[in-house]
């Protein structure tokens, strides 16, 4: 493994690796130890006590963070007829039908989120092998396959984030930027944590929030004390 740089080591030395901090302390410390020379993202990782091999323990969804993520999302909408106008008026960056299928097949990816009306999924389905691995395939569970394209686009633009438990049961998500106030980051964190608590599968046994950490882009991780987390 490559040796971390001096700046990283100095930042990491400020974090007690044996300690689990309160949410407020952890977020403040993560911001303090950010070493990026840009407005870094603040990321969280929840390791959940679930078995993702079981169909009833898959966790996937989306949540609108009260203070957004600080990142502007470029939205592509696949729609027909009056839904095209609806999407455009809601602020979608790109709206169309099969012409965007062809563009994507040719290697175009100037977008961050894809929304589709159900009647367009036959066309969008052709892109499964391309969009799937990038996590861009529209999905009803995340509200990106819907006839209410206005709501979908507005929520994404307002700071909606998708979450999904990986094989090891870990959910990664961005909760904002280092430039955010501690209060706004804590509020975003608690909103996401509350959603994950409500998503706990009834068949999941043992400790649900196994470990949680917060970090910034390129910065050291800070462990969070989960003992006060409510389920």
UniProtKB/Swiss-Prot annotation:
Gene3D superfamilies named in the record: 3.30.190.20, 3.40.50.790
The keyword Iron is assigned to this record: no
UniProt GO molecular function: rRNA binding; structural constituent of ribosome; tRNA binding
PROSITE patterns the UniProt entry points to: RIBOSOMAL_L1
GO biological process: regulation of translation; translation
Keyword terms of this UniProt record: Repressor, Ribonucleoprotein, Ribosomal protein, RNA-binding, rRNA-binding, Translation regulation, tRNA-binding
Gene Ontology cellular-component terms listed: large ribosomal subunit
InterPro entries listed in its UniProt record: Ribosom_uL1_bac-type, Ribosomal_uL1, Ribosomal_uL1-like, Ribosomal_uL1/biogenesis, Ribosomal_uL1_3-a/b-sand, Ribosomal_uL1_CS
Pfam families: Ribosomal_L1
Membrane-crossing residue ranges in chain numbering: none
Function (record text): Binds directly to 23S rRNA. The L1 stalk is quite mobile in the ribosome, and is involved in E site tRNA release. Protein L1 is also a translational repressor protein, it controls the translation of the L11 operon by binding to its mRNA.
Assembly mode: Part of the 50S ribosomal subunit.
Family of the protein in this entry: Belongs to the universal ribosomal protein uL1 family.
Protein name: Large ribosomal subunit protein uL1
Organism, as annotated: Staphylococcus haemolyticus (strain JCSC1435)
Gene expressing this chain: rplA
């Amino acid at each position: 493994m490559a040796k971390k740089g001096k700046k990283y080591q100095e930042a990491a030395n400020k974090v007690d690796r044996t300690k689990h901090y309160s949410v407020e302390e952890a977020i403040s410390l993560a911001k303090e130890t950010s070493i990026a020379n840009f407005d870094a993202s603040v990321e969280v990782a929840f390791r959940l006590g679930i078995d993702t091999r079981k169909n009833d323990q898959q966790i996937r969804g989306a949540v609108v963070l009260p203070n957004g993520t600080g990142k502007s999302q470029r939205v592509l909408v696949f729609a027909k007829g009056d839904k095209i106008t609806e999407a455009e008026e809601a602020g979608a960056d790109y709206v169309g039908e099969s012409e965007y299928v062809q563009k994507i097949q040719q290697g175009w990816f100037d977008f961050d989120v894809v929304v589709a009306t159900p009647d367009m999924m036959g066309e969008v389905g052709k892109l499964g092998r391309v969009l799937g691995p990038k996590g861009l395939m529209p999905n009803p569970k995340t509200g990106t396959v819907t006839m209410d394209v206005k709501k979908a686009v507005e929520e994404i633009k307002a700071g909606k984030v998708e979450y999904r438990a990986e094989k090891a049961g870990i959910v990664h998500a961005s909760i904002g930027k280092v430039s955010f106030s501690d209060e706004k980051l804590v509020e975003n964190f608690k909103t996401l944590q509350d959603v994950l608590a409500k998503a706990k599968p009834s068949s999941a046994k043992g400790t649900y929030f196994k470990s949680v950490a917060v970090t910034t882009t390129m910065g050291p991780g800070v462990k969070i004390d989960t003992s006060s987390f409510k389920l």
